[in-house]
Swiss-Prot record:
Function: May play a role in Cajal bodies formation.
Annotated localization: Nucleus, Cajal body
Domain of life of the organism encoding this protein: Eukaryota
N-acetylalanine modified-residue sites: 2
Gene from which the chain derives: FAM118B
Keyword field: Acetylation, Nucleus, Phosphoprotein
Protein name: Protein FAM118B
Length: 350
């Protein structure tokens, strides 16, 4: 006997398919209560290489330290700035995974004048070559991530990054928003950022490629900030009083710059509550990371099994946090199920 339309629909639902044959929507990860109840102004977003790699995956220099150094080396070779023996030496160090900070430092020294009194440097040319035309290399899913970050910034969240690129600033400019790039060479502005007087500024703790003189690879490069007790006190107060949300960071807390700024002088570590969004991936690695980070006051949260799950997860989280920041407590279900609730927040429409 022929099935009615209603019966066919029931059968499709039982077998997990819609009438057009498409698989059902994957059930989204639930949002952690202790994170989703935060307000934007209670957060400091920490942007790592994973975000830049997701925004512009075709740019190898954005994916890792090693990728960046290789790209700088390739640029130096293309510009005929290194002798054959020198380029072979650098390639060998990269291939053998020697200390990448030292390799990068040596390469920068090779491309820079022997005296700090001279502004002219080939390093700047290589940086601009590596990060050339980033705007055209952004992918839509990556832009969704930047949109969420920008929205939280506009609602009071602070943003710092370990990345040298200015993808967030470029995206904001495309949206008609002006963000300022800060680095650790400007103590006055860093202090104002930490005091929440420059909320639409992005603090690049390693520097940003548009200001090569501000790029630092190890603590010796920013002694001016470390010696400034007022700046350091304000920076460390952020880590003690706000919740840091690590995005695309992996092992950022092991970064020497991050440790010197936020971890080494922080007292009362038992009071900390920070968060790290990561892909679940390998179960053993995930478990190890979660245990290690929890000892540091950081809750590791899985946004899904695939990198592609992050934009949608972070968008839902942004909508929830931003709505709470505006109107107090709301139920997650209201946001997940109500297009009206989403549409109140720019960039959160379904």
């Amino acid at each position: 006997m022929a099935s009615t339309g209603s019966q066919a629909s029931d059968i499709d639902e039982i077998f997990g398919f819609f009438s057009d044959g498409a698989p059902p929507t994957k059930k989204p990860r639930k949002l952690l209560p202790s994170l989703k109840t935060k307000k934007p102004r209670e957060l400091v977003l920490v942007i790592g290489t994973g975000i830049s790699a997701a925004v512009a995956p075709q740019v190898p220099a954005l994916k890792s330290w090693k990728g960046l150094i290789q790209a700088l080396l390739d640029a130096a070779i293309d510009f005929d700035l290194l002798e054959d023996e020198e380029s072979k030496k650098f390639q060998k160090c990269l291939h053998e995974d020697k200390n990448l900070v030292h390799v990068a430092h040596d390469l920068i020294q090779k491309l820079s004048p022997r005296t700090s009194n001279v502004r002219s440097t080939f390093f700047k040319d290589c940086l601009y070559e590596v990060f050339d035309d980033l705007e055209s290399k952004m992918e839509d899913s990556g832009k969704q991530l930047l949109q969420s970050v920008l929205h939280l910034m506009e609602n009071g969240a602070l943003v710092l990054t370990t990345n040298f690129d200015n993808l967030l600033e470029l995206y904001a400019a495309d949206q008609g928003k002006q963000l300022e790039s800060l680095d650790l060479t400007d103590e006055k502005k860093v202090l104002e950022w930490a005091q929440e007087k420059r909320k639409l500024s992005v603090l690049h703790i390693h520097g940003v490629y548009t200001n090569p003189s501000g790029i630092v690879l190890h603590p010796a490069g920013y002694q001016n900030v470390l010696r400034n007790t007022e700046v350091m006190r304000e920076i460390q107060k952020l880590y003690e009083n706000k919740s840091f949300l690590f995005l695309g960071c992996g092992w950022t807390v092991d970064d020497t710059t991050f440790q010197a700024l936020f971890l080494e002088a922080v007292k009362h570590k038992s009071d900390l509550e920070h968060f790290m969004l990561v892909r679940r991936g390998d179960v053993d690695e995930f478990k190890k990371l979660r245990e290690n980070m929890l000892d540091k006051g950081i809750k590791v949260i899985s946004y899904g099994n695939d990198y592609a799950d992050l934009p949608e997860y972070f968008k839902r989280l942004t909508c929830e946090i931003s709505t709470r920041g505006r109107s107090g407590m709301v139920r997650e279900g209201q946001l997940n199920g109500s297009s009206a609730a989403h549409s109140e927040i720019r960039g959160c429409s379904t």
